[in-house]
Amino acid sequence: TPAEFDITDAVNKGENKLAVQVFKWSSGSWLEDQDFWRLSGIFREVQLVSRPQIHVEDLFIKTKPNEDYKDFQFELNLQLAISSKQAEKILEGKKAKIRADLFACDQGVKVGQAVQSFQIELDEVLVEPFSVSVKVKEPKLWSAEHPNLYLLELRVYDASKRIAEIITQRFGFRAFELKDGLMKINGKRI
């Protein structure tokens, strides 16, 4: 189970020393034994990540077909977060913007774009979640036989209109459904 710790308030300009104390037994010890790895210490990957003042906390992509599976609605659900209490004071009430560009991976051709400006209203350190959608005409559909992929390039702009973060995510246009007792992908029986 991944764990994340915000050390923003403990970091100073210049050189810092990061010390980690590991306890062999804790209230979560029974969880640690689930993989039968009963050693103490850090034995999995550890990363130290620096995030911009406003950044993507979570994103979810949905693709919805029209009735004949020719055109699709691309929907991006976003949860943005503010990186620190200091950034919270700076950004509260300011305007920010996201831009989502969709590219066909095999050709690099842009197939859609969504731009949305929003007021930064905070619920603790999370910006109110929102979604954007784009209609994409006749995308190449994803299936196991033809794994056509597209690329989402998401740009988050801060209140100063500078790029705060760029995230890329590959995805496919497909529709899975259980219809008349049959499993179907893109309207075709599996």
Q: What does each of the following model-derived ranges do?
A:
Residues 1-58:
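Accessory beta-strand-rich segments of carbohydrate-active enzymes
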Residues 3-5, 126-134:
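Short strand-edge motifs at loop-to-beta-strand transitions and within beta-strands
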Residues 8-12, 118-128:
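Short proline/glycine- and polar residue-rich coil/turn motifs
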Residues 11-15, 87-93, 135-149:
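Short glycine/proline/serine/threonine-rich loop/turn segments at secondary-structure transition edges
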Residues 19-21, 151-155:
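Extracellular recognition modules
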Residues 23-30, 107, 157-166:
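Short acidic/polar inter-strand loop motif in beta-rich domains
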Residues 60, 153-190:
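N-terminal carbohydrate-binding accessory modules
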Residues 70-120, 130-132:
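Beta-strand-rich binding/interaction modules
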